[in-house]
Amino acid sequence: MHPVLRLYEDVLSTAETVEFRLPPLPRFIFVVHGSAAIGGRVVKAGEAWQGEREVVVRPGPEGVACWRWELARGDAGSTVASAPGMITHEKLTAFL
């Protein structure tokens, strides 16, 4: 199976106590607006985080909008937010 590169836009608000748990995958998260605690590190607008382990994303006091790139097996499903106060849009899927 060919690998797939996916780009998501995640928006987490502060209206709810939310956290987004992501499974272990090679990924890169760029914070577009606001800030977030990603893997215990505060990442602000214009900054990025990268890693391959399981990670938790929590919005900062003003919420967060981020772009998330993930490299996965082609037969793996999408990793999307599914709780109040969170929304994910899959922007791009490219089979490599």
Task: Give, region by region, the residue ranges found by the protein language model.
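Jelly-roll (double-stranded beta-helix
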Residues: 1-96
